[in-house]
Amino acid sequence: MRSADERVQKRAWGTRPKGAGGVSDNHLPSEHLSPLAKLVDKVLAQVGYEMVAATDAIDDAIPGYGGLFDPTTTSGELQRALEQLLASDLSRPATSDPAGERFVLYVDGSSRGNPGPAGAGAVIMDAEEDVLARLGRPVGSRAGNNTAEYAALQLGLSELVTRYEPHRLEVRIDSMTVIQDVWGGDDPTEPGVEPYSEAVAAALASVPNHEYTHLADSDPNPADALATVGADIAAFGPG
């Protein structure tokens, strides 16, 4: 049996791309979503895509004992709760202090049906691999897995460079399609992912040194569960 080290592929430290700069907007773009899923995504954006903060706020805003994923919660109740939250003073949770200027970023995308309801997840860790942020969002109601993987990387990088000034970054990711585009210099092979690819390049421009670790399917990825919740939100309908 191969060791964990043998089951990953690593690339040497990258250098800062020339001529790139800037990061994506606070509210990240998405594929087609139902009106309800769009409202949830807006709430997520208001709290910096912190999944727990968003779902807790939504659950508290829904009357009675219902919640975001409670089958007894009607679409009307959910819509009213989301609209009330967006009209309130929602804010990002306090930013955790990192240990040093090196970071680890786990990312993952999930698509049911490929294409189907898709979500993105990302976990930001510091040099000691203490968790700083658990992020998630819906990507689209009929999006492919590769699109979700690009969206996950964009999500994690956007929040990382918004909150911190990373000097070194290790991205842990299982998508070779994204790896070959971002670090291998290949053109995107998935139709329609160019905006995500360009946003990733722009975010990486602010990180002087970065590398990737390719995760095997058997390697643990804490971003997976967040991507799954994002896909659950993307499945909200109708529309």
Task: Write out the residue ranges for each language-model feature.
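RNase H catalytic domain
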Residues: E159-L226, I233
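Compositionally biased, low-complexity linear motifs
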Residues: I124, G192-P195, F236-G239
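Intrinsically disordered, low-complexity regions
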Residues: M1-A94, L132-L135, Y164-P166, V229-G239
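Acidic helix/loop or adjacent segment enriched in Glu/Asp that either coordinates divalent metal
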Residues: A133-V171
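Acidic, metal-ion-coordinating active-site neighborhood of RNase H-like domains
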Residues: L44, Y106-G113, P220-D232, F236
